[in-house]
Amino acid sequence: MKPLAPFALIFGIFPLAALSQECAPGWMRIEGERAAAVAPGALIADMARRDVVLLGEHHDEADHHRWQLHTLAALHAQRSRMVIGFEAFPRRVQPVLDKWVAGSLTSAQFLAEVEWDEVWNLPAELYLPLFEFARLHRIPMVALNVERSLTETIAAKGWDAVPPAAREGISRP
């Protein structure tokens, strides 16, 4: 029997919850440009069969992060082999995420080592339940972002001004 491939949950890229300032009263499935109401159980079951699920939010909305945590828990109950990607972290902090999931850091150490206040600058309390869930269940966390200096250089000077070695593995947009 072929083992299930782990699937990834990527937070903060696609704004499903961010369609409004408040969480939607019902669950919505968005495919392409179409959105349709769907029963939560059916949507979770469908998401659990996918290789990648994108859960977005307004970064400063606590309700959106609670929704992410509840969705994550429901998905984990159906498919425990998963990976969670976070746009909050630049790739260079991946070793810190690995130490966190392994249980080698306190919350304070983790936030200091990922330079939370400098890099993300949002209340950590909004995100810590997600990080703690990953740690509790030993779900790998993946740093998805690039350094702010790279995005600033691209915005100011254009893609071609960035030497290939400084592109952090990113291809032409």
Residue ranges of predicted features:
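Histidine-anchored nucleotide/phosphate-binding helix
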Residues: 66-77
